[in-house]
Amino acid sequence: MTRTALITGATGGIGRSFAHALHERGYGLILTGRSTEKLTELSQTVTGGTAQIVVADLGTTEGIDTLVDVLERNPVDLLINNAGFGSHGEFAHLDLDHEIEELTVNVRALMTLTHTALGAMTAAGHGAIVNIASVAGFQPLPSMATYSASKAFVDRFSLAVGVEARKHGVHVLSVNPGPVDTQFFTVANAQAIELGRSANPDDLVAATLTALDKKRSRLVFPRVYYVLDALTGVLPRSLVARAANVVSGRK
């Protein structure tokens, strides 16, 4: 019987890489995103048009409800919560509605879809959920306050739910990538941040699927960011926030 995977944010760099890799592993695909044109192109490119496409804006209640309905009618073996975006600038000067939409996509949608998928997975006694967090969530990040806070939630939420789900045969993996070569930082208007070299999304997805195969609960990619994770865990948070502000302010 063919296994099925649902990928949110499927038309972005990481989502496309997941689509290619999972198709190669024999998964049937449900590809979701906001653009019918981009989803159709992706389905045709990856599967010859056999993948199911679902147009849904996860920044809206209607979009979230659309995917809840899909998951309830078509339980999946693997859920990839990849959709997300960030904004850049001082919080007081950013559009509040846009920041709330960011939380809706990064937190509310992810939490809702995880809850929905877990219902069928725990009943079946198997399944896996991959939630894409970020190394940005390791520390308070001035100029990306909402984004860093949302990704801290994703990481901690995934680890906690993963412990609960394990006894039901369900695996939850929290993935914390560093900068990845995608359109994210164009969307975030964060060109001023000195990021260094960005990772290839194909490499991130390969590492994620290896971690999934090994039943790991958490992945930090590339591995050098485990150092950042350790340091931010022992240093005073106020000091870490000030240091992050200095780094993000470099031109």
Language model regions located:
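Conserved glycine-rich cofactor-binding loop
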Residues: 11-12
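Conserved NAD(P)H cofactor-binding loop of Rossmann-fold oxidoreductase domains
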Residues: 82-87
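Active-site helix of classical SDR
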Residues: 114, 150
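C-terminal helical subdomain
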Residues: 174, 192-228
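Substrate-binding pocket helix/loop in short-chain dehydrogenase/reductase
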Residues: 90-92, 98-103
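Conserved glycine-rich Rossmann-like NAD(P)H-binding loop of the short-chain dehydrogenase/reductase
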Residues: 25-42
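Residue(s) in the substrate-gating loop at a strand-loop-helix junction
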Residues: 134
